[in-house]
């Protein structure tokens, strides 16, 4: 948990800290987006290296460089450095975010052969991640209340260092399977798989909404003179998402996961459209608990489908491409959200988030329905034997 806390902390902390130093949501959105782009851009290479040499060398490297990059970003903001230098520090920091989540999600299908258990495990993991996204904004709100926004960025750096050290001492890492003989998989690797490619494209679309939502809610709270409330509302959104994952993971579903994935995305889009006209911060927080409940199930189902569509020797790289799609979408959403709230309104930004998620659902419905139908026919044929 400690080593994964920067996932729910660093991007938003950078956004608010840079905004306080530059007085611009557009610049802050750009720097936060560059950070997320660094995470997303290097992830496939990290995954390929994990498949090839195991996770320990990369965890050591990231545990050292990531805190240094975030400290450098704070120093640059304090000295009013050029935006280009801020972007460079953010890019390096994002590129070396410790790959703890990728390691965990790669281990799960190797440890659990039963499909229902794997679905439950990914749901539990999504709940843990959502708890991180609850704790992250809450901690940011604490630092904002103290008028020490840099503290949130520095705290993320410390968590990454301490968490990586602790994770490397766990039995799962010590007992990581010895990598098999390396097999060439080409430059694109998992992207050559059509189903995975379509899954990644849908992920970019719905995760763009995540980034837009962050900026829209923080901008709305800031405009009303209560920036700390924005962090609380985002934490409530994560609570709702975690409840959704708990409900989803508590039972076995007869419906194929491809169709579950599409339905969850449609539900998420409807929730975002419902939030768009709400401007009262208390009601927005309450409604976020309900409207955001499909978010974690969408992410859990994405992991189930990646594990289902991927050969075992390529699991880490496939999950890092999934992370690239997810974080790349968040990065795009933060940048676009910053522009929309600067030139339009938080209402327009929330509508854009809903449209992006609805597009993801439509793409998934077209791209994955054929795969679901094929699996149903195969299962029916096997049961008839």
Description of each model-found segment:
Residues 169-208, 385:
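Juxtamembrane intracellular "pre-TM" segments in multi-pass secondary transporters
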Residues 258-302:
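C-terminal transmembrane helical hairpin of 12-TM major facilitator-type secondary transporters
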Residues 313-344:
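A late C-terminal transmembrane helix in Major Facilitator Superfamily
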Residues 1-40, 190-235:
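Helix-loop boundary and gating motifs at the non-cytosolic
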Residues 64-80, 267-279:
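C-terminal ends and interior cores of transmembrane alpha-helices
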Residues 89-130:
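Cytoplasmic helix-loop-helix junction between adjacent transmembrane helices
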Residues 41-55, 144, 243-257, 341:
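Helix-to-loop junctions at the C-terminal end of transmembrane segments
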Residues 14, 98-112, 217, 297-310:
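Intracellular juxtamembrane helix-capping segments at the cytosolic ends
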């Amino acid at each position: 948990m400690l080593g994964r806390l920067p996932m729910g902390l660093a991007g938003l902390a950078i956004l608010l800290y840079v905004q306080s130093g530059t007085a611009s949501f557009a610049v802050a959105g750009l720097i936060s987006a560059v950070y997320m782009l660094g995470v997303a851009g290097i992830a496939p290479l990290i995954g390929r290296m994990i498949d090839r040499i195991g996770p320990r060398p990369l965890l050591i490297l990231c545990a050292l460089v990531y805190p240094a990059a975030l400290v450098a970003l704070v120093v640059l903001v304090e000295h009013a450095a050029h935006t280009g230098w801020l972007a460079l520090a953010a890019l390096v920091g994002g590129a070396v975010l410790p790959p703890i989540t990728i390691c965990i999600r790669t281990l799960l299908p190797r440890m659990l052969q039963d499909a229902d258990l794997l679905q439950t495990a990914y749901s539990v993991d999504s709940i843990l991640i959502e708890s991180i996204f609850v704790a992250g904004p809450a901690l940011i709100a604490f630092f904002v209340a103290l008028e020490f926004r840099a503290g949130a960025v520095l705290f993320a750096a410390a968590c990454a260092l301490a968490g990586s050290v602790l994770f490397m001492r766990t039995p799962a890492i010590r007992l990581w399977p010895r990598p098999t003989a390396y097999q060439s998989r080409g430059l694109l690797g998992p992207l050559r798989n059509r189903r995975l490619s379509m899954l990644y494209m849908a992920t970019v679309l719905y995760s763009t909404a995540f980034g837009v939502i962050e900026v829209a809610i923080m901008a709305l709270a800031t405009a009303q003179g209560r920036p700390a409330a924005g962090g609380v509302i985002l934490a409530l959104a994560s609570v709702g998402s975690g409840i959704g994952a708990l409900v989803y993971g508590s039972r076995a579903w007869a419906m194929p996961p491809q169709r579950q994935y599409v339905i969850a995305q449609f539900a998420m889009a409807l929730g975002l459209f419902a939030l768009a006209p709400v401007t009262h911060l208390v009601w927005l927080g309450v409604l976020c608990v309900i409207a955001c409940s499909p978010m974690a199930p969408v992410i859990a189902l994405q992991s189930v489908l990646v594990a289902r569509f991927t050969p075992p020797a390529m699991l880490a790289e496939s999950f890092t491409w999934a992370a690239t799609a997810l974080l790349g979408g968040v990065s795009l959403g933060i940048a676009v959200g910053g522009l929309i709230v600067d030139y339009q309104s938080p209402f327009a930004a929330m509508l854009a988030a809903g449209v992006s998620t609805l597009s993801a659902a439509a793409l998934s419905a077209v791209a994955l329905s054929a795969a679901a139908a094929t699996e149903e026919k195969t299962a029916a044929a096997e049961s008839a034997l």
